Amino acid sequence: MTDLQKVLLALLLSLSLAACDQPGGEVPDPVDPGPEEPDDPMEPGPIEPDPDEPDPIPEEEFLEDSEGREFSYVPVGDLLPNSGPGHQDTTIYRPDILFPLEDAAFLNSQVYRYGGSQGSLNGMEGWQCETSNYDYPWQDTFCESRSRSQIMCPDGGHEGVDIRPATCIPESGATHWAVAVEDGRIVGLDGSKYTVRLQTEDGTLYRYLHLKMNQLAVADGQFVTKGQRIGKVSNDFYNSAGDLVPTTYHLHFEMYQNYAPDEETDPVFDQVNPYMTLVNAYEKKLRAQ
């Protein structure tokens, strides 16, 4: 290689190096391209809903009658000691009936409490106007011991429940009205000494006992509407011989329906325990006052 060729080669190398240099200083750091995008990005999944808030615990309901007394009741079938086996039936047979008395009322025993012939069995000697007879809690008297045969009570028993009115009538002299629990017709009244029967269109039968029979507000065969007055609470009662029998001032209330204890047994038309049906009706009455 000649000297001229060496000079030209050196010049070319110098020009190539100059072209690669960055004018003004340092070479910048390379830019990070970041993660590569996937070829087939996944679709976002469904958004998980927030868990449901737990239902609030309902507040306990306290109901009071017109005198400010708090309503309460002993469980169905839980009778006074020494008064009978009771009948455990929580069925509300007629949820829409009206309570059969216009005013406040107290369900409890007329025989095994103060004023009753067997009150001494529970240390309740005294007369029927004893204050505790006219207070809560209610207590069931269906299947209370009696000599009468009753399909619900294998040993015989009380066919309905006993309801004291708001006040003790011999002491207060007040009038307390019994009313129709449903629309219906008064049946079998002629010749009846102490019972008024109300039958509904579907055959359900109610019996009201011990009303003041010579001052009834209804007649035999009369159609009545729910809430219509039937008669005044009293103590009319007679034995099978027609003799007057003493009893306390109260309404004895019965309900007859087709009843079968299970699916294998044919139903019979007989008394059913109205206690829980009346509890339901009374609670509705207190809420509406």
Which positions does each model-derived feature cover?
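Bacterial N-terminal signal peptides that target proteins for export
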Residues: 1-8
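Hydrophobic alpha-helical targeting segments used for export or membrane insertion
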Residues: 9-13
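C-terminal motif of bacterial Sec signal peptides marking the signal peptidase cleavage site
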Residues: 18-19
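Ser/Thr-rich, Pro/Gly/Ala-heavy low-complexity intrinsically disordered linkers and tails
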Residues: 23-54
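Surface-exposed, glycine-biased beta-strand/turn segments
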Residues: 54-194, 226, 282-289
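Small beta-barrel nucleic-acid-binding modules, principally OB-folds
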Residues: 156-171, 200-204, 255-265, 272
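Zn2+-dependent peptidoglycan hydrolase active-site motif and core
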Residues: 156-158, 172-220, 238-250
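Conserved, short, structured surface segments that act as functional micro-motifs
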Residues: 199, 222-289
